[in-house]
Amino acid sequence: FSREQCLEFARGSLAKVLGPEFTVVDSYPARVRLPDEPLMLVDRILSVEGPMGSLSSGRIVTEHDVLPDAWYLDGGRCPISIAIEAGQADLFLCSYLGIDQAVRGRRTYRLLDAAVTFHGRLPRPGDVVRYDIRIDRFVRQGETYLFFFQFDGTINGEPVLSMRNGCAGFFTAEEIEHS
């Protein structure tokens, strides 16, 4: 998927990106989206694996280009928070795997927990950071869905950061307000 398709996923129609089986999702009052600019940090989606709409495990591989004029650079480096946020395509993957059809626009995404480890230097201009993101499983308790995920970020095949024990869920506005 191209950057333009990622931006369409963020701003526009899910069906235009993933196909007509997702048309109903475009009518929901809320759905999972990648962030729009300036926080769109997915420049390409190289591959997506897993049965579409299955609420099962899956994998997505993305890349983020660290450009010389990137708004977020600090001292010629990508800040820790941006390096982590650039692994944001778990959003695309959970939608592809069917969470929007399950929650029907009544619940929204919240990251609950994760453990991040840095293995090397922070990304610099000219680097391309590849994120290999895996959703291990979805669980449901009543109407609440959670999923568990992890990712590895590399530059030229060298480990830069990893996230383990990632957990995100889908909650109503009332549940979020009272949490």
Please place each PLM-identified region on the residue numbering.
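Catalytic strand-loop segment that frames the active site of acyl-thioester-processing enzymes
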Residues: 1-4, 15-24, 28-32, 36-79
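HotDog/MaoC-like acyl-thioester-processing domains
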Residues: 1-12, 43, 53-56, 61, ...
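Active-site helix/loop of acyl-thioester processing domains in fatty-acid/polyketide metabolism
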Residues: 45, 68-69, 78-106
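Hydrophobic beta-strand-centered segment that forms part of the acyl-chain substrate-binding groove
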Residues: 5, 13-27, 33, 38-39, ...
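Short Lys/Arg-rich amphipathic alpha-helical segments
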Residues: 69-73, 104-106, 121, 156
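Residue-level marker of positions within ordered structural domains that often coincide
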Residues: 50, 67, 92, 138, ...
